[in-house]
Amino acid sequence: MAVRMMQGVQAVYLESDAFLVCLNHALSTEKEEVMGLCIGQLNDHGRSDSRLAYAGAEMCTVAKKMEATRIVHIHSVIILRRSDKTKDRVEISPEQLSAASIEAERLAEQTGRPMRVVGWYHSHPHITVWPSHVDVRTQAMYQMMDQSFVGLIFACFIEDKPTKIGRVLYTCFQSVQASKSSEYERLEIPIHIVPRTTIGTVCLRSAIELPGILCQEEQEAYRRIHGLTHLDSVTKIHNGSVFTKHLCSQMSAVCGPLLQWLEDRLEQNQQRLQELEQEKEDLMEELSSLE
């Protein structure tokens, strides 16, 4: 029996509101990497054909499995809080993955669609968009649990030297085992941004929770350092000043633009509501004139 099977993902469709949350999260800090999980659904289509061939008393069964078309649709993301902030590494704890699975189940009940954790994303500040060897091995570990699991990378704070113009690059990948080797290598997956006219409730909540998550990370780091017994008073005062400076920077870089964006969207929604109410009145007048 000969079986041919395609196990990888052929394409990823990322909705624009989820893309916006990922981008805002990646741009929230340029000193450390950030991370999150992607919630969505998998469309897996395929068919199998079986044919029986007889040759005398012998029977040969040939089963052919058509290549399955696996498409990942990402509808929302969950921003994860970092327990250890490092410049070139991010880690997702089993507790965070379990909590994300519970959130996906809750969304599945609300939407009536088979929502699940379909991937993860993280940022690459000031470095290339391509995954590192650690990223490729981490992705391979996730694919051992789910073959359709994908990884997204957002490379930000990249400046074109001649023009001084900043760029943001993004990519989607999976890990495949290299031929004649035990190592893994990246397989780039085509990613498409799906436009949306409105921002979903889940993505809006994630965007609003971002400042609080960043503040919790700073508080945990400060408490961990402040709890050391061998620090003198001057060092503690300095650490407190650094903590205050980081919070003020977050308010300026994250909270302020987020508040302005929400106010702008509220104004747009109010204008749209007035337009719809006026259109309703015009239609009602036209309907009454026909009677």
From Swiss-Prot:
Coiled-coil region list: 259-286
Cross-referenced CDD domains: MPN_BRCC36
GO function terms (MF aspect): cysteine-type deubiquitinase activity; metal ion binding; metal-dependent deubiquitinase activity; metallopeptidase activity; polyubiquitin modification-dependent protein binding
The enzyme's E.C. designation: 3.4.19.-
Recorded superkingdom: Eukaryota
Domain MPN intervals: 12-179
Keyword Iron-sulfur attached: no
Residue ranges of the motif JAMM motif: 122-135
GO biological process: DNA repair-dependent chromatin remodeling; double-strand break repair; mitotic G2 DNA damage checkpoint signaling; positive regulation of DNA repair; protein K63-linked deubiquitination; proteolysis; response to ionizing radiation
Keywords tagged on the record: Coiled coil, Hydrolase, Metal-binding, Metalloprotease, Protease, Ubl conjugation pathway, Zinc
InterPro entries: BRCC36_C, JAMM/MPN+_dom, JAMM_MPN+_peptidase_M67A, MPN, MPN_BRCC36
Matches recorded under SUPFAM superfamilies: JAB1/MPN domain
Binding-site residues for Zn(2+), renumbered to this chain: H122, H124, D135
SMART domains: JAB_MPN
UniProt similarity note: Belongs to the peptidase M67A family. BRCC36 subfamily.
Function noted in UniProt: Metalloprotease that specifically cleaves 'Lys-63'-linked polyubiquitin chains.
UniProt cross-references to PANTHER family, sorted A to Z: EUKARYOTIC TRANSLATION INITIATION FACTOR 3 -RELATED
Protein name: Lys-63-specific deubiquitinase BRCC36-like
Organism this protein belongs to: Mus musculus (Mouse)
Gene name linked to the record: Brcc3dc
